[in-house]
Amino acid sequence: MAKKEVKKIVLAYSGGLDTSIILKWLKNEYGCEVVTFSADLGQGDELEPVREKAFKTGADKVYIDDLREEFVRDFVYPMFRANAIYEGSYLLGTSIARPLIAKRQMEIAKIEGCDAVSHGATGKGNDQVRFELAYYHFNPGITVVAPWREWKLNSRQALINYAKRNDIPIPITKKRPWSSDRNLLHISFEGGILEDTWLEPPENMFVLTKAPEKAPNKPQYIEIEFEKGNAVAVDGVRMSPAELLAHLNTIGGEHGIGRVDLLENRSVGMKSRGVYETPGGTILREAHMAVEQITMDREVMHLRDSLIPRYAEMIYNGYWFSPEREMMQCMIDESQKTVNGVARLKLYKGHCRTVGRKSESDSLFNLDFATFEKDQVYNQADAEGFIKLNSLRLRIRSLMLANKNK
């Protein structure tokens, strides 16, 4: 669709430097109505000035929607039922937020009669893929305006100069030369000084977590209860999904838990450094795996675990709404029907460690069979036949090699 044919755009708007400039640029270049949409996913005070700033920058209408409960209940929790983790470190805090933002953005586009949608993701990053795959899932014919792939503002300084010319406040400063993205699951930091892969992130960058060495000298023990793979209570107090994750963020942050610094492989092919704070998510994943240990069948767990790298890649690469992810989610959720129990964790100076787990209804730990003391139900002599049968292929191969070398 040509620029002159676009009549109304809904922009995913954070109020930061990039989307503020995009809002003004859309008004200047497309000359159309622009509706902004900001999702409250737990950013805190960041959203307070967004409405006023959007109108001042030229928005015709502003949506700010509280999606915190939906975010944790329908996106974070399903992902955590899978124990999803990308490249061994990343708990996918940004990746899992984009499908929900895009979903609501497309709903607003329909309500407002918009013929195009826009986002602030760069042409080098993952988010452009995540947003647009979701857009096309909901409306295969939607027009997507991606300014970073159109304009000539191809450097941070060019953006700043454009902002100054158009009287757009610039939130980035020399004191904090990096960009960040926050929601209830994590805060991510990238760019700026973090592009030096040898440089340790400065302590004043972190928001949610204390430095582990400055965390309390006394460990804290907590208990997290699960029903069908979902956390429902902390220390006996039942909470909604968003409340529970926020509570774990506070506790984990106090003990310096959940800092990650990694070079990840982006979906477009390059490597990029990301620094993350995920205190509540780190605790939640550890607790979930602890309850699974006592309630999940071995073969079910191993089969599920073998698929999780692929599942995590789907989320990272923007395929949340794909049929393969939905199919795999059905399998994962089936495996979680027996994941009912309580995990006991010890939090201390950046570490989160399981120290106990129990399940009144679904425990597969049977002391009569597992004990190292004298037992009446397990005949240890039976192990001989089991071992001989399982070693058969190894013994046959050994005989073959011996004959071959004669």
Curated annotation (Swiss-Prot):
Q: Which GO terms describe its biological process?
A: argininosuccinate metabolic process; L-arginine biosynthetic process; urea cycle
Source organism superkingdom? Bacteria
Pathway in which this enzyme or protein is active: Amino-acid biosynthesis; L-arginine biosynthesis; L-arginine from L-ornithine and carbamoyl phosphate: step 2/3
Does the keyword Transcription feature in the UniProt annotation? no
Residues that hold ATP according to the record: A12, Y13, S14, G15, G16, L17, D18, T19, S20, A39, G120
Which keywords does UniProt give here? Amino-acid biosynthesis, Arginine biosynthesis, ATP-binding, Cytoplasm, Ligase, Nucleotide-binding
Q: Which GO terms describe its molecular function?
A: argininosuccinate synthase activity; ATP binding
Q: Where does L-citrulline bind?
A: Y90, S95, N126, R130, S179, S188, E264, Y276
Catalysed conversion reaction: L-citrulline + L-aspartate + ATP = 2-(N(omega)-L-arginino)succinate + AMP + diphosphate + H(+)
Q: Which residues bind L-aspartate?
A: T122, N126, D127
Report the transmembrane regions from the record.
none
Instruction: State the coiled-coil residue ranges.
Output: none
Location in the cell reads:
Cytoplasm
Summary of subunit composition and partner proteins? Homotetramer.
HAMAP family found in the cross-reference section: Arg_succ_synth_type1
Q: What name appears for this protein in its UniProt entry? A: Argininosuccinate synthase
Per the UniProt entry, what species is this protein from, by scientific name? Citrifermentans bemidjiense (strain ATCC BAA-1014 / DSM 16622 / JCM 12645 / Bem)
Name the encoding gene, please: argG
